[in-house]
Each structure stands twice: as structure tokens, then as C-alpha cells.
């Protein structure tokens, strides 16, 4: 059938994607610390360079960030997204939720409140809280308001800057593996699809 022929072509095309591999640090592909990585097949390029009148920088972090992180509150994690991650339970090898959750979203939890400064040099509760007239966090006023970590700068200076140069991955090797797994599953070969999914989970958490 045409559907079968199409799926066979899909498998063939994905088998021809070579020379790529999964990146261990998932978040590095979305914060400018690992542009055009070995997992990236195609990504939208940005740059802070203004040579010869060029303007390839963006304000993506302002659109992504919550107001607590000096953003515009335009693109926020939904309750559905957070629930989808958490309903699996704390099953990661770290003893926490899926590691990709912590690399994708800032939210109120022990991980972001352990004194390691994972939220721009401080704890989550010192960003998402009320402040006194001297701009000091008021103890006991913290709240949970998830904010995307993906497509946000890695450090305070980057957060403070009104512009950023974070590339946007449009196709990654992980996407290729997932598409191949989907086709294999639809063909009735879940035993071949599962190892592809596990390969991603083993690397990305």
C-alpha cells in the first residue's frame, strides 16, 4: 500500500542520517552554550555581532522569561506540561523527575533551592517572592510559578542584557530517532522502537 511504501521510505531516509549523536547536557542546546552541537541537524542562527550593520540578535529571552526573571510573561509553561512530567513520578536515575524537566523549566523544588545558585546565582525562592523597599527577598513569601529555562541565558549578565544570541534548534538527531521509532511502532515492531526511545532517555535523562 501507499502507506507501507511511505513508511519504508521514512525508515530509509532516517537511516541515512549519519554523523550525529545525542548530547549529554540537554539544556546546552537551548542556552547558547553549545551552538550547532553534534546533535543539531539544523538550527536558526543568531549572533550578537553588529559588524557591517548586521543585526542577528534576538530578545527571545524576554518573550520566554517570566516577569520575575525580567521577561514579558508571553510564553509560559502550562499546567498540562508540568503535570505530564510529574505524573511519571520521580523515576530518573537521579531520584528526581525526568531530568529534562529540570533542564527545561525553573520551578519551586529542592533542586532549585539547595543553595547551589542554579537560578542565576541564587535560589528559586529568592527570585519568586515578594521584596522589601530595599529589594531584599522577604522570607516566607515565595511562591511556585514555573518559568522556562530553555532559550534563556546561562548567567546573570546574559539575563540582564536586553538582547541575546541563542540559536533555535529546528531539527535534532533525537527528533530523527523518535520519528523512526514512531514508524517502526506503526509497522508493528515495538521491539525495534523501544531501544531508540531508551537511547534518548539514557542520554537525556
For each feature predicted by the language model, list its residue ranges.
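Short alpha-helical segments used as structural interaction elements across diverse proteins
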Residues: 54, 59, 97, 142, ...
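Active-site beta-strand/loop architecture of penicillin-binding DD-peptidases
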Residues: 131-172
Amino acid at each position: 500500500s501507499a502507506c507501507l511504501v511511505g513508511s519504508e521510505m521514512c525508515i530509509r531516509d532516517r537511516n541515512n542520517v549519519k554523523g550525529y549523536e545525542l548530547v549529554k547536557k540537554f539544556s546546552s542546546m537551548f542556552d547558547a552554550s553549545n551552538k550547532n552541537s553534534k546533535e543539531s541537524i539544523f538550527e536558526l542562527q543568531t549572533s550578537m555581532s553588529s559588524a557591517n550593520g548586521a543585526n542577528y540578535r534576538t530578545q527571545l529571552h524576554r518573550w520566554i522569561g517570566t516577569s520575575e526573571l525580567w521577561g514579558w510573561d508571553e510564553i509560559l509553561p502550562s499546567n498540562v506540561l508540568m503535570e505530564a512530567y510529574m505524573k511519571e513520578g520521580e523515576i530518573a536515575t537521579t531520584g528526581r523527575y525526568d531530568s529534562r524537566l529540570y533542564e527545561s523549566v525553573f520551578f519551586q523544588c529542592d533542586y532549585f533551592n539547595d543553595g547551589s545558585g542554579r537560578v542565576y546565582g541564587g535560589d528559586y525562592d529568592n527570585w519568586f517572592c515578594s521584596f522589601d523597599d530595599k529589594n531584599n527577598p522577604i522570607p516566607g513569601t515565595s511562591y511556585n510559578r514555573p518559568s522556562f529555562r530553555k532559550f534563556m541565558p546561562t548567567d546573570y549578565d546574559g539575563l540582564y542584557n536586553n538582547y541575546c544570541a541563542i540559536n533555535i534548534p529546528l531539527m535534532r538527531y533525537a527528533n530523527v530517532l523518535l520519528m523512526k521509532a514512531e514508524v517502526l511502532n506503526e509497522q508493528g515492531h515495538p521491539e525495534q522502537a523501544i531501544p531508540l526511545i531508551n537511547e534518548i532517555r539514557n542520554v537525556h535523562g
